[in-house]
Amino acid sequence: MNSPVERLGQGFQDLLAFGINDSAASVFQAMTDLTAVIDCHLRGIKPISDIVAFIDRRNVVQHSLMSLPRGDELNYGEVSSVCLYESIRHAAIIYSAAVTFPLPPHAGVFRMLATLLQNILEECKFDPCWQLCPRALLWILVLGGIASFDTVERTWYVQNLAAVSAALNLSEWEDVAEELGKYLWLQSACEGGGRLLWVEVLSDRPHLEENILGISEV
């Protein structure tokens, strides 16, 4: 089995030409590489020796992420699912605000991003991409759910995660985290919020009546 760092970002390769284009894939790879650097530094495996160079690199990656075009700015046919592209782009922005380009939580940015992501997902909840890419949806919903902590949007994320995780037959957090680690995920920064969210998801499972985003079986 690959190590967590080796798995990081692998999930995006399966989305090329469907949910992301080459430009987005390049940005997400840069974010993956940056995450690996941060992880190795925090675990003492390879401390960052040149903090100025690291900050410059981080700023370049963030600028590239924020410069990605919106879904409605893409050329026709550039991706098969504009809905999936936009959802992934916004989830990556949430991740950057927490990990690669951290912003203070009291600034209200996480609630704003969680609300924007929820609106995108609601607008395209019948898109067939969710049946085709349920694991990407899992990652998107977890990041949105973490960002929605202590907001009214939290319940929406919990309900949808309960449905998607049930469809994927995921009941243990460790199995969920393994799936998340194939995209953008830093355990030291995301694990705490993820576990809290998962407790709420499991509590909601017995009350699951419908899958809001249309994932019935995978």
Task: Enumerate the language-model features and the residues they cover.
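Intrinsically disordered, low-complexity activation-like regions
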Residues: M1-V218
